[in-house]
């Protein structure tokens, strides 16, 4: 739908300053304030990816993003090899089907936003409303907050950060995001998840249960899968 009709564009920051957003400092051991529940939508060379990645607030218009060795890191490294930045949108508090699709891991040629749209149609009987950011990235129009910009050629320190196991993750050199614009709904609600708590474990573990069940069924009949509390909802299953 048109940006003019999109709730996420009801308010636009005159001057980019992400430090004014209600982004929490979750644990005392963390490096600082972290975006923990936002979804990054990236497009480059005709390929789109939508996924979760924590983001450290470095300053008014820069984040440092932890990219684990999955599709988005592959995209960024390929673009860097050709001297390109990667255009992105960062969406906060979209419809839950977007969160679920972004938490899944597919083959690199599967578009998570298309999966989210299919889930929305299946559950609600209506299309998922999408709109276009000023940099050309398509994102859910009903998100509470949207930011747009680029994953740059620069790296900076990311971490320490308390991760899903409750232990402190290492400091690494990770890509820097430059934010070009910020918009939000009227009376917006900023979605954050507490690292290592129930929502974190649900979003990481829930999409894995069907893949584990399918894999086990190739060897022996599997009735159900439970990701255990002892495995932090991620590292072990029965």
Feature-to-residue mapping (PLM):
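Extended, highly charged
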Residues: 1-161, 166-238
